[in-house]
């Protein structure tokens, strides 16, 4: 903890050694966060770069959360800004009656034996809007109301896109399980 305090002080003072250490400590984890949102490694690297530039030019960490949580929040915001700029956050509205019922994977015993890499690949294959809502809902634990506000969409659109993401993921999971059984 004492080392983290020194790191924070160094970053606030603009010390290159502290910035380098911060980048070394968090860049791999934050690249994974950026990739979860963008679904494209080149874009994830761009977002990561922009996020760290933002952190280093305006080190506004106030200590209200852990340093890792704050950096993650910056990277999520950068990822959402990137998706908005690229117009990749779809505002597609799917009516719930058009969506199939999806069994709960935990009830059906599905998902066992799937690697984290495979799960991340499934997430990366989701359409941009669905992937964004899925990440915010599942990993960032945001409500549909919060997601709607962040993405400037209707709350129902958030719900629909999460359902669509689950449906696509379920289809991928079943196909993966079938290929493993062969």
What do the PLM-derived regions correspond to, one by one?
Residues 1, 81, 89-116:
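Internal acidic/polar
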Residues 7, 23, 31, 41-58:
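Conserved RNAP core-binding helix
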Residues 8-32:
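A short, charge-rich alpha-helical start-of-domain segment used by transcription regulators
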Residues 12-13, 49-67, 86:
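Sigma70-family region 2
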Residues 40, 143, 153-157:
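Helix-turn-helix DNA-binding motif, specifically the short coil turn and the N-cap/start of the second
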Residues 62, 73-94:
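Arg/Lys-rich amphipathic alpha helix in sigma70-family domain 2
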Residues 133-137:
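A short pre-motif secondary-structure segment
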Residues 171-178:
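Conserved small/polar residues in nucleotide/adenosyl-binding loops
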